[in-house]
Amino acid sequence: MSGLTHFDAAGHAHMVDVGGKQETQRIAIARGTIRMLPATFALIRDGKAKKGDVLGVARIAAIQGAKRTAELIPLCHPLALTRVAVDFELDDALPGVHCVAQVETFGRTGVEMEALTAVQVGLLTVYDMCKAVDRGMVITEVSVREKRGGKSGDWKAEDTAG
């Protein structure tokens, strides 16, 4: 792995120059989990949360988060995203909810940060909508699971099947 790219020789932070990079299809998939009490899980599963459709609102928030990543992370390039897909999986065994975001663009830099931001914002929205009944929810295991495209090529997390 190469050195840190967001610092110059003097150690000052800067936005990486991607002007000379080739435009390619870029895809990143991120995943995260929010663990909660069984009663909170039941409210989400049964659609009975007082604030409304928890996962529907969280999906829209996650998409918005991906689109606004460059406003939140100082050295991220603003990107024209071509696709943001967000899915939630209810997990009775935790109990909790998994969030998976896939973000795509055709450009000169990757979309890993956008995928991570989508997952975090989606899970934060679940927390916000359910905190009145469960302040002990825990957001955990947020990570990039896969990335495709660009000079460094494709990558999958080692524990990712397939």
Curated annotation (Swiss-Prot):
Assembly with partners or alone: Homohexamer; trimer of dimers.
Active site as annotated: D128
Keywords: Lyase, Molybdenum cofactor biosynthesis
Purpose of the protein: Catalyzes the conversion of (8S)-3',8-cyclo-7,8-dihydroguanosine 5'-triphosphate to cyclic pyranopterin monophosphate (cPMP).
Gene3D superfamilies: Molybdopterin cofactor biosynthesis C (MoaC) domain
The protein's annotated pathway: Cofactor biosynthesis; molybdopterin biosynthesis
Biological processes per GO annotation: Mo-molybdopterin cofactor biosynthetic process
The protein, known as: Cyclic pyranopterin monophosphate synthase
Enzyme class name: lyase
A Pfam family assignment: MoaC
Reactions catalysed according to its record: (8S)-3',8-cyclo-7,8-dihydroguanosine 5'-triphosphate = cyclic pyranopterin phosphate + diphosphate
InterPro entries reported in the protein's UniProt record: MoaC (IPR023045), MoaC_bact/euk (IPR047594), MoaC_sf (IPR036522), MoCo_biosynth_MoaA/MoaC (IPR050105), Mopterin_CF_biosynth-C_dom (IPR002820)
Binding site for substrate: L75, C76, H77, M113, E114
Lineage: superkingdom: Bacteria
Name of encoding gene: moaC
Family affiliation: Belongs to the MoaC family.
Species for this entry: Burkholderia ambifaria (strain MC40-6)
A GO term for molecular function: cyclic pyranopterin monophosphate synthase activity
EC number(s) from the headed UniProt entry: 4.6.1.17
